[in-house]
Structure formats: structure tokens, C-alpha cells
């Protein structure tokens, strides 16, 4: 089903990847952010026969994301019967074991890309990589439990010129930069299960369109959180957004 907002189109459960139609069930990573919340809303709205099994990675080093995910889930489940119970999994971004794994992952040449003539890692920092690795393991667990794809709300970065003009290009994850879309696919088979990222070819302007067109700005949107910085990252405004990180800047640009 093709859905268009802010002049960007997402083909949700497209025929190429879902030749028999929308799946009977889907696992969904509900992060507490506005992207995954909007994806859950769209699936629940347009595919009421598809069961949505949400989960959240409960970070012991930053619980506010899970608090937001619980609030988002309560709102969505109150509106849609196909939203099932939220499953929580404990992770810790600062876990020494996972930090060591993250350092090795970031040092691996296969996880580096060329940006402005310099090799850089796919992740912005080691803590971000640590959480990504732990969440990957949980996605695999959920995929096997429900024998279906795991949907995420990951979108691509704003245009390069926008990020540079607004001063947040250097804090963005390079793996999400817009560019050669021919090398991307909404299905990722790399880790023995399928991660489904229908927003991968669109940026957060599409997401803002979902909230605006469905009148979610005053109820669902305030329940979400995008800021990734806690006290450990120097956010003096915590638990309020720092106003400096990539996520704060991206959200401000998309919803202006």
C-alpha cells in the first residue's frame, strides 16, 4: 500500500517483499521515538488484520526511552485491538562486555565507510554501537519467537546540505545518509532473520506528515522522545531534550 506524506512515499508491505499480502503478524521495535510510533500507527490503521507484537530494549543506563515507549504503547493499544502486549528486554549501553564487543565491531574495516575522503564508523560512538548490538540480538530472538519479520522505524538522514547548514552533520550516523539508494533494500537479511525498514528511503519529514495528517500532534507526538543524550553524555537538561544532539536537531527540522 503506497502512502504519501510530505511529498515522500512509503510502499507499506509492498508486493515485491510481501507477494501474498500483508503478514498475519509482525514484530515491531517500539523505541519510544516518533518514527516507530508512527509506523505502529500506520500498520494498525491500514492493516487491522495484522497482529503487531511490539518490544522495547529497556536500557538500564537510560530508562526514559522505555518510559516513553510504555506511554506510546498504552495510547496505541487504547485505539487499536491488533496492538499486542509490549515486551521489555533489559540492556545496558555501558555494559563492559558489550562495550568491548562494540569497540571490536567499530574497528572492523567491514563496518567503515568513506566520508569526505576519510574512513569513519557506521555508528556515532561506542555506546550507540553497544546498544545497537544488544538490540540486534533481541530482534533475532523476537523474529524466531513469532516467525515473522521485525519492523523498525529507521528513516534516512535529512539532506546533506540541510544537516551541514543547521550544524548537525558531524553528529549524524553515516549509515543513514541519503545517497545511493540502489544499494539499499527495505529487507535486511544479514543476521539470519529479516529486519523490515519501510522508511529507509524517506526522511523524518514523512514521519511529521503522519502526525500532522492524522491529527496526532497534540496527543501521540508529545508522548514520544527523540533525544539520545542522558546525564552520562553531558545533557544538563535531562530528562528534557538536550537540544544539541542529532536527534534533537532532526526532530526540530522535521516538525518545524
Regions found by a protein language model. Give the residues of each.
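Nucleotide-activated chemistry modules centered on ATP-dependent adenylation/adenylyltransferase
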Residues: 1-256
